[in-house]
Amino acid sequence: MRRLTTAVFVTCVVLGFVGTPVASAQQQLSFSVGGFSPRPVDARATGDVLVKDLDYLAFRVSDFSGPLFGAEYLAGLGDNFDAGIGVGFYQRTVPTVYNDFVNANGTEIEQDLKLRVVPFTATVRWLPMGHHNGVEPYIGAGVGVFNYRYSESGQFLATDKSIFRGTFVGSGTATGPVILGGVRVPVGSWGVGGELRWQSAEGKLPADQDFSGSKIDLGGFSYTFTINVRF
């Protein structure tokens, strides 16, 4: 919560120093739907739990690619800048089995790996063509506060080769940079567009849960279709 408050505070400070008061600036709500793709294996953080799990579980990191939904409030800072505060939601469950071991009856030793991320972001966009053109390309950057929950649930192999059922959970918040770019096409008081985002953050996992890694890499790319409502 402290990190989220900091992100919101940073955006409010930016708004406070704008020459044009926000109350009289162009404002809009942006709703987005698209997908999130996590960092590939060779780009993930050292100690990442998914990379460690690949040593003995059958899955791919790309299996965690999944749908992403979001909403954002945007306020114009003059004709060439926007400041925004947004929230999103991503969740993905990936079924896995052990690579080299099975149950005594020959069935697979099965688990579910589940990752949920709720990103809160504070961003600033630069619109080189301004707000009053038929097409509005933009680039921007900001900070993200990523609320995450990672779990592994199902059957597991103990050190003595016995099989047991269990659920292991790690959750928390992590902060990191956000870089974005996109284009909007105004249609009256509405607008449509597309956006690409890159994010980077690492979430810590509790040692008492015996995960194979000490962290979960939350970085990756998101690509969304946007609908904007101006007011």
Regions found by a protein language model. Give the residues of each.
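Repeated loop/turn-to-beta-strand initiation elements of outer-membrane beta-barrel proteins
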Residues: 80-83, 132, 188-192
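Cleavable N-terminal export/targeting peptides
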Residues: 1-26, 231
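Short glycine/proline- and aromatic-enriched beta-strand/turn motifs that initiate or cap beta-hairpins
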Residues: 22-75, 228-230
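Transmembrane beta-barrel domains of outer membrane proteins
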Residues: 72-75, 125-129, 182-186, 228-230
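Outer membrane beta-barrel transmembrane domains
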Residues: 195, 216-231
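Membrane-embedded beta-strand positions of outer-membrane beta-barrel proteins
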Residues: 29-33, 85-87, 122-124, 137-143, ...
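Transmembrane beta-strands of outer-membrane beta-barrel pores
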Residues: 33-39, 87-93, 128, 143-149, ...
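Extracellular/periplasm-exposed beta-strand and loop segments of Gram-negative cell-envelope proteins
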Residues: 38-64, 89-120, 146-174, 201-222
